[in-house]
Amino acid sequence: MDIVKIICAILLPPLGVFLQVGIGKDFWINLLLTIFGLYILGLVHAIWVIARER
């Protein structure tokens, strides 16, 4: 299941975070990082959240 979340995070980082933790602090941080043109930071944050919440 983590592979699916990581693939979702690569395509759309907030989706990967949402699938892992739902709508919370990490989701909103990731959404802001992704929206403001910092896709790579959003991606790194999403992978970190997915790996951390195992």
Swiss-Prot record:
PROSITE patterns: UPF0057. It comes from Synechocystis sp. (strain ATCC 27184 / PCC 6803 / Kazusa). It is a multi-pass membrane protein. Keywords: Cell membrane, Membrane, Transmembrane, Transmembrane helix. The keyword Cell membrane applies. Belongs to the UPF0057 (PMP3) family. One of its GO terms (cellular component) is plasma membrane. It comes from the Bacteria. The chain crosses the membrane at residues 3-23, 31-51. It is found in: Cell membrane. This is UPF0057 membrane protein ssr1169. Its main location: membrane. The lineage of its organism: Bacteria, Bacillati, Cyanobacteriota, Cyanophyceae, Synechococcales. Pfam families: Pmp3.
